Every structure is written in C-alpha cells, then in structure tokens.
C-alpha cells in the first residue's frame, strides 16, 4: 500500500493556521459540485474514464482543502491533505489509500500521458462516491 507523507513533516513545512472562512469553504464545495456536474454530463466510458477519475480526484482534493479550512488550517502540499485525512480518520484508512492511488494516477496522466484503465474506476467507483459523501458530511458538521 501507499506510504503517506509524515504528518509531523507536514506540520513543520506545509501547514499553517488560518481563520475559518465559511464563505470560502462553501465556495470550494460549490466548485467541487460543479466538477460533479461535468462528470455527469460527459458520462463514463473507456474513452473518458481517465478524465473522470482525474476530476473525481480534484473533487476529493477540493473537499480535503475545505475540510482542513473547516479546522482552521491550510496546506501548501497536496500529499499533506491525504496525510491529514489518514491521521484524523484512521477508521477510513482504505479511503486514504485510494485517494493516494488516485493522486498517483492523476499525476501519471498529467505529466506522462498515461491513461487510467477503466477497471480501476469500475473497481473503485462506489468507494469514490462514499469518500465524497463522507467529506461533505464531515465538513457540514464542522460548519454548524
């Protein structure tokens, strides 16, 4: 399985405290929801799956940013977003591993042109949706 960035290193180098800005958090959530609309419009097949997975990763990343902001912190490193989730939600470790794998696949797509196999999406689609719903639920609890 994937190794996560050390949280202590994240705190030292990439994490800073910020004011909780509910409007900014809501705006980030809205951007993530618009990405979902795009996914729904283009549909998912063998031709589009790489870009669908990429967009799902971006949705998850945006929701992680919102989750951190809801807790009064901000990260300048995407891997620290995953590390934060792994540290604070140990019961959802398998989700953290999937997010890390999606990050890896997204980077391979963006920097090397390696397409994502449909089987990855097919195997993980339910978990991806559960991750998104769980993040939204946790953020809403923090904003109340």
Residue ranges and their predicted role:
Residues 1-144:
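Terminal alpha-helical segments
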């Amino acid at each position: 399985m994937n190794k996560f960035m050390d949280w202590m290193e994240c705190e030292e180098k990439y994490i800073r405290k910020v004011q909780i800005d509910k409007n900014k958090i809501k705006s980030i959530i809205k951007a993530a929801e618009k990405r979902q609309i795009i996914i729904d419009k283009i549909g998912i097949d063998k031709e589009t799956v790489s870009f669908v997975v990429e967009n799902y990763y971006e949705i998850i990343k945006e929701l992680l940013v919102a989750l951190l902001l809801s807790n009064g912190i901000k990260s300048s490193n995407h891997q620290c977003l995953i590390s934060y989730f792994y540290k604070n939600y140990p019961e959802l470790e398998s989700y953290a591993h999937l997010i890390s794998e999606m990050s890896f696949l997204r980077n391979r797509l963006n920097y090397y042109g390696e397409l994502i196999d449909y089987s990855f999406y097919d195997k993980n689609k339910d978990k991806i949706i559960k991750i998104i719903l769980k993040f939204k639920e946790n953020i809403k609890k923090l904003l109340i």
